[in-house]
Amino acid sequence: MSQPPVAVLGAGSWGTALAMHLARQGHRVRLWGRDPEAMAAMAEANCNTRYLPDAPFPPGLEPTADLDAALRESSCWLVVVPSQAFREMLQKLAPYRDDARVLVWATKGLEEHSGQWLHQVVAEEMGVNFPCAVISGPSFAKEVARGLPTALTVASTTPGVAERVAEWFHGERMRVYLSDDVLGVQLGGAFKNVLAIAAGISDGLGFGANARAALITRGLAELMRLGDAAGARRETLMGLSGLGDLVLTCTDDQSRNRRLGLALGRGESLDAALAAIGQAVEGARTARMAVSKAAELGVDMPICHQVHRVLYVGHSAIEAVGELLGRDQKPEF
């Protein structure tokens, strides 16, 4: 008897790449997207023609715009939609929920209007005891789609769920580590995007490798302070979903957040930079949440504050750098 299919909900680059990986692991995968024309084009071309045109789908991957068809009989729901669409997606899933299914999300960010972590949104929409997990780590869609080696972390507080999800993803080219620090895994994955914008701004200004290394290191200190105040574990933030994702996103131009920063550092406007990227840039939204969480928890996050000022207060990139460098001296730790 064949295994139940996996429903991957969100057919952007990351959702498509994860769907391809799961199909290569031998799973039947239904990749859902809301645009019928786009999904029909994927089915005809056997690839995601918009985001990953050079990565043909493996056997077992079925694109569809029919949500009922995607969810029917599925054992796992993998949600890979932008954070602002996360709650709406869960509301569509709620009528199908039962204890035999597992909800996994690979979305990075917080809910913008409420400031809630995504696990809090899951609890509100699906119930506090619904089996769920978050998967995150240093990973670019193009590399996962090509089957290049990748390591991720899956976190759940539901007994046995992290192990079950890890078994689905673990393979020759993907290693999956286990955690029960759901908050810590989300925190690193969300706020590193803001720091990647900062690193991009620095490089766009031509400030070089020294400045980039300083931003990554002091950015990690901001993540650690926020994690301490929020209740995350420090070792989580030193792992794949924290430091690993931070280094990757700050140093490689595959990162949309870094590319946004590069454009801003070179003097482009926010609107023009976002239009040129053409996909969701989670760090631009999360910058607001960083400032809000820092104020709520009484945490000093100067780099994130300066990114917010460049994005939304009208500060120039060079003004932001001056304010960071002009801060009072203090101990490193």
Curated annotation (Swiss-Prot):
Physiological role: Catalyzes the reduction of the glycolytic intermediate dihydroxyacetone phosphate (DHAP) to sn-glycerol 3-phosphate (G3P), the key precursor for phospholipid synthesis.
Name of this protein: Glycerol-3-phosphate dehydrogenase [NAD(P)+]
Keyword Coiled coil included in the entry's annotation: no
GO biological process: carbohydrate metabolic process; glycerol-3-phosphate biosynthetic process; glycerol-3-phosphate catabolic process; glycerophospholipid biosynthetic process
NCBIfam families: PRK00094.1-2 (NF000940), PRK00094.1-4 (NF000942)
Sites where the protein binds sn-glycerol 3-phosphate: 108, 137, 139, 192, 245, 255-257
Similarity section: Belongs to the NAD-dependent glycerol-3-phosphate dehydrogenase family.
Catalytic activity: sn-glycerol 3-phosphate + NAD(+) = dihydroxyacetone phosphate + NADH + H(+); sn-glycerol 3-phosphate + NADP(+) = dihydroxyacetone phosphate + NADPH + H(+)
HAMAP family, A to Z: NAD_Glyc3P_dehydrog
PROSITE patterns per UniProt: NAD_G3PDH (PS00957)
Transmembrane segments annotated in the record for this chain: none
Domain of life: Bacteria
Signal peptide as annotated in the record: none
Alphabetized UniProt keyword annotations: Cytoplasm, Lipid biosynthesis, Lipid metabolism, NAD, NADP, Nucleotide-binding, Oxidoreductase, Phospholipid biosynthesis, Phospholipid metabolism
Binding locations of NADPH: 13-14, 34, 108, 141, 256, 282
Pathway(s) this gene product operates in, as recorded in its UniProt entry: Membrane lipid metabolism; glycerophospholipid metabolism
Main subcellular localisation: cytoplasm
Catalytic residues as annotated in Swiss-Prot or TrEMBL: 192 (proton acceptor)
Gene Ontology CC annotations of this record: cytosol
Record's subcellular location: Cytoplasm
